[in-house]
Amino acid sequence: MLIYNDILNGDELISDSYDLKEVDGIVYEADCAMIEEGAVEVNIGANASAEEAAEDLDDGAVKVNNIVNSFRLQSTTFDKKSYLAYLKGYMKAIKAKLQENGSSAEDIKAFETGASKFVKDTIVPKFKDFEFYTGESMDPDGMVVLLNYREDGVTPYTIFWKHGLKETKV
C-alpha cells in the first residue's frame, strides 16, 4: 500500500486504495463518496410487535466524505484572491523542494508551466464550485486539497498537486 504525504509538512493526504488518476502530469484526481459515519444498528433478536409503532431514534449517523474523513482533512475557506496568493507561495515552496531534491531544470520548468496552465484552465473558471481542505495539522503552508463534483453533480472528487506529494510504501 502506498500513502501519499504532503511533501512540505508530512500530513497523510491520500493512499493508493483510492483510484488515483493523473491529469496533465500535474495533479491527481481521486473519486470519493459520501458515506454514513457513526450509524449503529442494534439487533436484540426480538420480533417487532404489530401493535407498537416503530421507534425512530437518532443514532447520530452523519454523512461524510470518505477521503476527507479517512485522512482527517480539515475544511478551510478561500476567496479567489486569497487562494491565488496562497497558491503563488505554495508553488514557490514546491519549486524549492524540487530543487532541493535534485530535480532537473526541465522537470521544474514543466511543473511551473503545467501548474500555471491547470490553475488558469481548471481552477479559476470553476473556482466557486470548489471546497478546500488542509491536512490534519492545518499547516497554512501545506497543500490545500480541492474537492469538486463531476459533471453528474453527484460524484465528489478530490484534486492533489502531484509534485506536492511524497510516496511512502507501507
From Swiss-Prot:
A GO CC term attached to the entry: microtubule
Signal peptide residues on this chain, from the entry's feature table: none
- Give the organism's phylogenetic lineage: Eukaryota, Fungi, Dikarya, Ascomycota, Pezizomycotina
Keywords per UniProt = Cytoplasm, Cytoskeleton, Microtubule, Protein biosynthesis
S-S bridge residues = none
Q: What GO terms are given for molecular function?
A: calcium ion binding
What species does this protein belong to? Gibberella zeae (strain ATCC MYA-4620 / CBS 123657 / FGSC 9075 / NRRL 31084 / PH-1)
Instruction: Tell me where in or outside the cell this protein is found.
Output: Cytoplasm, Cytoskeleton
What task does this protein carry out? Involved in protein synthesis. Involved in microtubule stabilization.
Query: Per the UniProt entry, what are the Gene Ontology biological process annotations, in alphabetical order?
Result: translation
**What is the protein name given in its UniProt record?**
Translationally-controlled tumor protein homolog
Q: Which Pfam families match?
A: TCTP
Q: What is its main location?
A: cytoplasm
Q: In what residue span(s) does the TCTP domain sit?
A: 1-170
Report the sequence similarity comment from the record.
Belongs to the TCTP family.
